[in-house]
Amino acid sequence: KTLFMNYDKPVEEQTLCAFLLDVADSLLRAKGFFEIAGKGWQQVDLVGRRVDLKPCEPKEKAEMVFISKIGPAIIRPLTAAWQQHFGEPMPLKN
């Protein structure tokens, strides 16, 4: 199962990494682009339990793709982890 999200606010690096690590064991991979507070736009890659960030060109809005190891069952833990870390509903699409 592959899911997508867009987001239109800068995020804190520590918050984004904590969110990704909370769901890492249920994902094959996650990749996207976020505006990181204090760092600007970053390409974000999650493989296993490793989160890598590297500078990238500015985007219109943040976006991320999640590739699930557990099929559609990823939706509930993914949205719950986002709510816990960011304090708002996750703008998830499938």
Q: What are these model-predicted stretches?
A:
Residues 1-94:
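P-loop NTP-binding site
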